[in-house]
């Protein structure tokens, strides 16, 4: 989008469309003893606060103060994940999976089963010095979490190596109906699934909804043909084919 409001925080949109034969996809409920494997990029402080940071108003000075909120993408690592998931031998091992977004380990792994025990010390780090909270909420990109049966875990780890992907067993499905996280031998999170599913205490607020004003844009040109060409010449409307062919190619 070409707009003065995006000078400091530019907007780029990219997408990948994938397809897998239905016979190669499992959709199963995790059972106690299943293993959660984290694969892809390592975890760092980049991404801590990313979900809220992306909604802030930014200016030129934001680069200095908010640079760590959203990580610069690592396209080659993403490509390796895509290549791995094209392998039917891999997808047939996966009971359930999640990508990492807002909330990091807490959400991406925390959503996979009702009862979970996560060992944060096993989460691969980009550098030392991260505490348990940072490991739990970091939104570092290029990461996936998959649930596999205990007997399939070693095979999955070996298959990940074929794409030069780092994969680590970091959590186990339990029958406790609680989400627990351990760091340096201490249990730092112990929350019941019943509470998590409640979304917390009820919140109420008063809002005033105003009707949006219609956008009236005058188009230069005497004839419809001239107006059409002038519209097509607008950077926000013209073909983006050139960009799409260069992006992550």
Language model features with spans:
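Glycine/proline-enriched, intrinsically flexible loops and inter-domain linkers
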Residues: 1-249
């Amino acid at each position: 989008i070409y707009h003065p409001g995006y000078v400091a925080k530019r907007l780029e949109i990219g997408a990948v469309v994938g397809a897998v034969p239905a016979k190669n996809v499992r959709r199963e409920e995790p059972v106690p003893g299943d293993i959660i494997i984290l694969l892809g990029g390592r975890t760092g402080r980049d991404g801590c606060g990313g979900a809220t940071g992306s909604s802030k108003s930014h200016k030129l000075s934001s680069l200095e103060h908010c640079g760590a909120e959203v990580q610069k993408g690592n396209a080659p690592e993403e490509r390796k994940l895509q290549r791995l998931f094209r392998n039917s031998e891999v997808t047939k091992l996966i009971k359930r999976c999640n990508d990492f977004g807002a909330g990091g380990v807490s959400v991406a792994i925390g959503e996979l089963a009702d009862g979970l025990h996560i060992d944060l010390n096993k989460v691969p780090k980009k550098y030392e010095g991260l505490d348990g909270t940072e490991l739990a909420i970091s939104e570092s990109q290029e990461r996936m979490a998959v649930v596999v049966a205990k007997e399939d875990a070693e095979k999955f780890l070996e298959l990940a190596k074929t794409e030069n992907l780092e994969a680590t067993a970091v959590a186990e499905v339990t029958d406790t109906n609680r989400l627990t996280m351990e760091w340096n031998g201490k249990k730092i999170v112990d929350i019941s699934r019943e509470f998590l599913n409640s979304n917390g205490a009820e919140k109420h607020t008063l809002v005033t909804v105003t009707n949006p004003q219609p956008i009236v844009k005058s188009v230069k040109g005497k004839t419809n043909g001239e107006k059409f060409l002038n519209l097509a010449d607008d950077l926000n409307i013209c073909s983006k084919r050139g960009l799409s062919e260069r992006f992550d190619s």
